[in-house]
Amino acid sequence: MDHISEKSARRVVVLGTGGTISGRAGAANDNIGYTAGEVGVADLLHGIDAPAGIALAAEQVAQVDSKDMSFAIWRTLAQRCAHWLAEPDLAGLVITHGTDTLEETAFFLQAVLAPSKPVVLTCAMRPASALAPDGPQNLRDAIAVAAAPDARGVVVVCAGTVHSAVEVQKVHTYRLDAFDSGDAGPLAYVEEGAVRQLRDWPQADPAARSSFDRIAAATAWPRVEILLSHAEARGSLVEMLLEERRRGGAEPVQGIVLAATGNGTVHQALEAAALRAQAEGVSVLRATRCAEGRILPKPGQRLRDAGALTPVKARIALMLELLADASAG
């Protein structure tokens, strides 16, 4: 734990997990050929001034490229968040994270924490070694949100925009403002250190406390796979998963998310296989692969839909549902 400022009534704790924001390349003009997770979170805070009345502290939770994010890191991160959120002098948390799976981690934390204080994930599209890194400004903005008196819930801050964990998606491979909230739009903007709120902060999930307890106690997390519906899609991958399950494999599939076209439509061959999987006890959920919009339910649908959740977020929701079912059974 590195304390950056000592004299204050309220603290913002920055938890580091790696990512591009802590990446380093061999040349300052190289924004893509870097190694993620090279710079410690305490070093990222050098030169970052705390807002008035706030002390900064840093804790390294993990140091990975976020493409390699794991359930084990998620569990540890959730536990460290819960620890700090219980501290009475904590104003809020900031988590530095890679952009690739940031939306998954944000959604997971929103589902298992019930924060009455802000938990702010931030990131960078350029490594720390870049000529003009975007990480320092994103970190300043994230700290401003974490210190905002009325802020709460799990949010993402990137390029001056604040997104809800439920709606945020990475929508660009390279641009600095790589995230978007689709139809819902952003929650707020950060302008010269001031937070301009546009809509309500995220509400806590009533099931979060129970979900947290279950993931903390779980020896294994349910296996949930994502399969894409597309032209000439087939059910062979579903059949492979079912055959592995029938043989009593060490980690049998328990859930399948279908990344569906349009308003939740699925190729007939893939749908037939998914219905067979459902009949054999596998939980199946449809989520639209469209960047915006939600699935509007239609009568007679035999496969559940995930509403406005993206396939990767639907996977997390289904995993937590399966954990709850196992606990109840």
Regions from the language model: what does each represent?
Residues 2-11, 15-19, 25, 40-49, ...:
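Accessory alpha-helical/coil subdomains and C-terminal extensions
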Residues 90, 115-118, 279-284:
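A short helix->loop->beta-strand "cap" motif at the edges of active sites that frequently abuts
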Residues 260-329:
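C-terminal non-catalytic interaction/assembly regions of soluble proteins
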Residues 87-102, 249-263:
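Short acidic, glycine-rich surface-loop motifs adjacent to enzyme active sites
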Residues 121-194:
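Internal gly/pro-rich beta-alpha loop/helix module
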Residues 75-88, 241-248:
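Short, well-structured alpha-helical segments in soluble
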Residues 1-84, 272, 292:
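ATP/NTP phosphate-donor binding region
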Residues 95-117, 169, 266-275:
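Short Gly/Thr/Asp-enriched flexible loops that form oxyanion-binding sites at enzyme active sites
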